[in-house]
């Protein structure tokens, strides 16, 4: 059983056969060819694989989101349905939001491809900090599953992120999706944008609409009522598609 590793903290948050499998993977992902490569790739525009946590790929056979207790299920279940559907439909990796309670402690990896969600006050002992604890497969370096510990402060305060209720909710959704992204194998894609020699908070690429990746540290993503909580198409989603392709490409 692999051991969990602590992800970075977030603030208020065979050649022919292999080739055929790769082509099938790209087709099932439902994205443009430019979203993936013909060799394993671990970073691209607006995304980066979480190789520091031993994750190099995303297994195609699906993941299940479960909950540490009934409170976590009641409070957080709805925040996972959107990104779960997006990964299922656009990446081709089934992600199911269940009603299951799993009491595996956060210090241990859950069973294969389970993602356990916790709703807890200051999981790191610091105001406004949530955390992902991704696990990886020792056999092939794919995302195994893990634990997501969401800081309850985001919900106990109605204006934690913003006094604007719509914006506040978009931030909540993005915070949840950000942590899910870590479990699925995405790291922070920040880079030294201003070339001052330091990679800083919010230093991330922007798309034509001005949005940064949802995986940007300490926060990013769409901030609208309709798109909040989604992986940004040309950044995060492209990265997840590549991680899925990597699963096959690493077997060649």
Residue ranges and their predicted role:
Residues 170, 177, 182-234:
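The catalytic-center signature of Zn2+-dependent metalloproteases
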Residues 2, 29-75:
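Disordered inhibitory propeptide/activation segment of secreted metzincin zinc metalloprotease zymogens
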Residues 116-149, 201-202:
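Catalytic zinc-binding patch centered on the HExxH motif and its immediate surroundings
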Residues 65-105:
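A short alpha-helix/helix-coil micro-patch that ends at or immediately precedes a cysteine
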């Amino acid at each position: 059983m692999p051991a969990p590793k602590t992800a970075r903290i977030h603030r208020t948050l065979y050649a022919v056969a292999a080739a055929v499998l790769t082509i099938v993977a790209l087709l099932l992902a439902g994205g443009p060819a430019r979203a993936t490569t013909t060799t394993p790739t671990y970073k691209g525009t607006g995304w980066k694989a979480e190789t520091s946590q031993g994750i190099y790929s995303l297994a195609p056979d699906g993941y299940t989101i479960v909950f540490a207790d009934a409170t976590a299920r009641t409070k957080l279940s709805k925040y996972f349905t959107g990104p779960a559907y997006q990964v299922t439909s656009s990446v081709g990796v089934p992600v199911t939001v269940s009603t299951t309670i799993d009491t595996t402690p956060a210090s241990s990896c859950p069973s294969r491809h389970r993602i356990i969600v916790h709703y807890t006050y200051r999981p790191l002992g610091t105001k406004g900090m949530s955390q992902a604890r991704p696990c990886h497969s020792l056999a092939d370096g794919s995302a195994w599953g893990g634990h997501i510990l969401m800081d309850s402060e985001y919900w106990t305060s109605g204006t934690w992120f913003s006094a604007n209720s719509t914006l506040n909710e978009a931030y909540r959704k993005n915070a949840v999706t950000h942590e899910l992204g870590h479990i699925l194998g995405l790291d922070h894609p920040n880079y030294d944008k201003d070339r001052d020699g330091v990679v800083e908070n919010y230093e991330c690429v922007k798309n034509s609409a001005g949005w940064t990746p949802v995986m940007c540290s300490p926060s990013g993503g769409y901030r609208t009522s309709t798109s909040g909580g989604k992986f940004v198409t040309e950044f995060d989603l492209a990265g997840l598609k590549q991680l899925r392709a990597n699963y096959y490409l690493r077997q060649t």
